[in-house]
Each structure stands twice: as structure tokens, then as C-alpha cells.
A protein has these predicted regions:
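Exported/extracytosolic protein signature
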Residues: 1-186
Length: 186
């Protein structure tokens, strides 16, 4: 529950020695266990080469990032945002950002809207920033493109990371992970 959980009290037979008394010091004190519920996010990010050889990225080519965010926790979340800085040695492709297939306007200066962060939601609930748990359609999909600078030297590594937060729940900067590698949070 959003209130921090539910307390479950466990005690012995109330017919023996009387009813449970959590304030007393006798053998009828219940053992209390706090049941916690909270949102928990699974954030995957993959890249796809859009030009030429799908296995080789060259200078001047376009790279597409696809990020999926799912609340796999036991509680709904509100105020969920994603932030993603454009990787070094690339330029954002104007107008390429979508959330669940719907265009997201660029920042006023033409930058990616993800640089400053945007509220996200899954198609199951169109409320901005809401990610429900246990919904059948609770997977948000964010897509954007970048172009590798034409003068980038051969061997340059293009690296990028997205971060998801739900500040109302004390969740900040959970990094994305590329599920195609064994390295966590890469």
C-alpha cells in the first residue's frame, strides 16, 4: 500500500492465557510483521542500426534506441519519469521521440525531450506519470533516434543510459539495462 505497508499481527491461541495485548510484556504479545508493497521497475534499452549493415555502425549513420519500462512491483506508481541524455559523438534526430507510438514534442530549442525528462505511462492507463502494477498493458515504450557524427573516428564507442524515477515513492535514477548483454545496468 502507498501508506508504507500493512502490519500483520501473529499471536498464539487467545483461549490460552487471554487475548493478545501488543502493549503488554506478557506472553500474549503478537509478533508483528510489516508487509511492504512498492513499485519496482524493469527498464530495458536496446539499440538498432538503421542504415547499412545491421551489425556494424559507421560514422554518419542513424542509431535507434528503444526503451521499455514496466512496473513489476506490487503497487501502482505515479510521478514516473524517464531521463536520457543524448550520447557523446551523436546528434539527436529532431522529431524522432515517441511514447507508446505517439510523437513527443521536442524541447523548444530542438533538443530531445528526454534530456530534461518526460512523464511516462503505459497504454493501459494514459495518465502521464502513472505506471500501474499488475495491469495487462503496463509496458511503456520510448523510442528516439540519433545520428553518429560523420567525423567520428573508427573504433569510437557510443554509449547511452536511460534513468527512471518515481520520486513520490523514493525511487530515483534506476538505470536501464541492455538485455542482450550479461552486464547489469549497462
Amino acid at each position: 500500500a502507498r501508506d508504507g505497508g500493512t502490519t500483520l499481527a501473529i499471536w498464539d491461541d487467545p483461549n490460552s492465557n487471554g487475548p493478545a495485548d501488543p502493549t503488554g510484556a506478557d506472553d500474549e504479545n503478537p509478533t508483528q510483521i510489516l508487509i511492504q508493497s512498492a513499485p519496482l521497475f524493469d527498464i530495458d534499452k536496446i539499440s538498432t542500426y538503421l542504415d547499412g549493415d545491421p551489425n556494424v555502425l559507421l560514422a554518419g549513420e542513424t542509431l535507434r534506441y528503444t526503451i521499455t519500462v514496466q512496473n513489476i512491483g506490487t503497487d501502482n506508481a505515479a510521478g514516473v519519469e524517464i531521463v536520457d541524455q543524448i550520447p557523446a559523438n551523436t546528434a539527436y534526430v529532431a522529431g524522432s521521440t515517441t511514447l507508446n507510438g505517439v510523437a513527443v514534442p521536442d524541447a523548444a530549442d530542438g533538443r530531445s525531450p528526454l534530456v530534461d525528462g518526460i512523464p511516462i505511462n503505459a497504454p493501459g492507463d494514459p495518465t502521464p506519470g502513472v505506471m500501474n502494477a499488475a495491469a495487462t498493458d503496463n509496458l511503456a515504450t520510448i523510442v528516439f533516434d540519433v545520428m553518429v557524427y560523420p567525423d567520428v573516428p573508427d573504433g569510437t564507442v557510443i554509449s547511452n543510459q536511460a534513468f527512471v524515477s518515481a520520486v513520490d515513492y523514493g525511487i530515483a535514477d534506476i538505470p536501464s539495462d541492455d538485455p542482450r548483454t550479461a552486464v547489469p545496468d549497462d
